Amino acid sequence: MKKRLLIIVGPTAVGKTDTSIILAKELNGEIISADSMQIYRYMDIGTAKPNEEEKKGIPHHLIDIVNPDEEFSVAEFQKIAKNHINRLIEDEKLPIVAGGTGLYINSLIYDMDFTQSISNWELRGALEAEAREKGNEYVYNKLKQIDPHAAARIHPNNLKKVIRAIEVYEETGEKIGDFSTDLNINQEYDVFFVGLTRDREELYDRINMRVDAMIEQGLIEEVKNLLSLGYDKNLIAFKGLGYKEIIGYLEGAYSLEEAMDILKRDTRRYAKRQLTWFRRYENIHWYNLSNYDSCENLAECILKDFKGHFNSL
């Protein structure tokens, strides 16, 4: 018998946290976060982590597991998340995976083998040096020659992704896009897959209000504290939404109002990319929260469909 798994995805600020907590209470579940920013300690406000009161006594896993200067790969997520899933099933609890990081979700629903890590630090260093000496465009043109399809999808100034695509090609002879297609569904789990969305204007309003709330809650102080602890502003963790904008403000690159406007704009764009990613999934049950009075009413509908799915097997 396959292991039952509930997965909840959707764009940032849509209501995944509240919905997943309600469902966890009703289904005797625990939550496994699939958010690549909530893994970091000391980064709470900018990552919208639920506090203890908001968790309502529901255990949450894969939150606060590494420091901001530590690396954490999709492979590591997959390993730890599966360990939690298997333990919860043994304890007769329902694992509920909730989050908006598409690669994390892919690692659970597809048969993705990370045993052979694709990396070439020497090549990476050489490409970074070339970018410093000759500019990002020079390195980008290398990618265009070997993988024009990837180049068309990556901005020339997104040096990290440009180098990664070159690195994968040089190490495997395969184009990076080939690793995200023709994936086989993981037969280990019987997944009830939930996708949450809202009407666009409502979602964008929620994003704007979330940014305002983050500033009021102390996001600027949180960033200052991280820097005072000695964490380098160039760390991957600081590339996340909310942190890079506030660092720009602190360095005088723009005013606080400008930083907030940039953060709101970039978060809206990120939400759009998330929806594009999740809409590629098959067998996903979509729910528009704009059609419900509350997350509680939505949860009732999801519960009915969830039980119907497994009763029909």
Curated annotation (Swiss-Prot):
Its EC number is 2.5.1.75. ATP binds at G10, P11, T12, A13, V14, G15, K16, T17. One of its GO terms (biological process) is tRNA modification. The record marks T101, R124 as: Interaction with substrate tRNA. It catalyses: adenosine(37) in tRNA + dimethylallyl diphosphate = N(6)-dimethylallyladenosine(37) in tRNA + diphosphate. The keyword Magnesium applies. Residues 35-38 are annotated as: Interaction with substrate tRNA. Keywords: ATP-binding, Magnesium, Nucleotide-binding, Transferase, tRNA processing. Its cofactor is Mg(2+). GO terms for molecular function: ATP binding; tRNA dimethylallyltransferase activity. Substrate binds at T12, A13, V14, G15, K16, T17. Belongs to the IPP transferase family. Catalyzes the transfer of a dimethylallyl group onto the adenine at position 37 in tRNAs that read codons beginning with uridine, leading to the formation of N6-(dimethylallyl)adenosine (i(6)A). Monomer. This is tRNA dimethylallyltransferase. It comes from Alkaliphilus oremlandii (strain OhILAs).
